[in-house]
Amino acid sequence: MKTTKVAKKEEVTRDWYLVDADNKVLGRMATEIANILRGKKKPIYTPSVDTGDFVVVVNAAKLQLTGNKLADKMYYHHTGFPGGIKSITAGKLIEKKPEDLIRKAVKGMLPKNKLARHMLKKLKVYAGPEHPHEAQQPKTLDI
């Protein structure tokens, strides 16, 4: 009888990947990033263990959205006070905080459980081309 080997947290080796978001479509890029954060392309992938790698995204301010999503797509949050629902379009969010647009897209593609918070901590997003993770020697990932 064959048994399935379950990955343990201590056995996982984590790599660093660098993604350039310049002229990339948000959704297509976010799905690839979510798969890397989960570790789905590794042979030791286990759904109940965080086997994913670190991802550094640069040039978040230069990403693309298809169609009229810059003007039509709305992002909502609530302040907690009565009548405190706030909304912002995707175009204004790119101007104000381009990192949040990628982070929200990837967060929606991760599992809705406790592991998602640990996976999201491995995502580092920067609006410009510079990042402070050169010491980790990230591999360039072409998406």
Curated annotation (Swiss-Prot):
Which GO terms fall under biological process for this protein? negative regulation of translation; translation
Stored SUPFAM superfamilies = Ribosomal protein L13
Q: Name one GO molecular function term.
A: mRNA binding
Kindly state which keywords UniProt assigns to this record, in alphabetical order: Ribonucleoprotein, Ribosomal protein
Record's GO cellular component terms: cytosolic large ribosomal subunit; ribosome
Q: Is Ribosomal protein there in the keyword field?
A: yes
Q: Which InterPro entries does this entry report, sorted A to Z?
A: Ribosomal_uL13, Ribosomal_uL13_bac-type, Ribosomal_uL13_sf
Q: Does the keyword Ribosomal protein apply?
A: yes
Q: Which superkingdom does the taxonomy of this entry point to?
A: Bacteria
Q: Supply the Pfam families for this chain.
A: Ribosomal_L13 (PF00572)
Q: Which residues cross the membrane?
A: none
Q: In which family does this protein belong, per the annotation?
A: Belongs to the universal ribosomal protein uL13 family.
HAMAP family documented for this protein: Ribosomal_uL13
What job does the chain carry out? This protein is one of the early assembly proteins of the 50S ribosomal subunit, although it is not seen to bind rRNA by itself. It is important during the early stages of 50S assembly.
| UniProt cross-references to PANTHER family, sorted A to Z | LARGE RIBOSOMAL SUBUNIT PROTEIN UL13M, RIBOSOMAL PROTEIN L13
Oligomeric form and interacting partners: Part of the 50S ribosomal subunit.
Q: What is this protein called?
A: Large ribosomal subunit protein uL13
According to its UniProt entry, this protein's organism is Geobacter sulfurreducens (strain ATCC 51573 / DSM 12127 / PCA)
| Gene designation | rplM
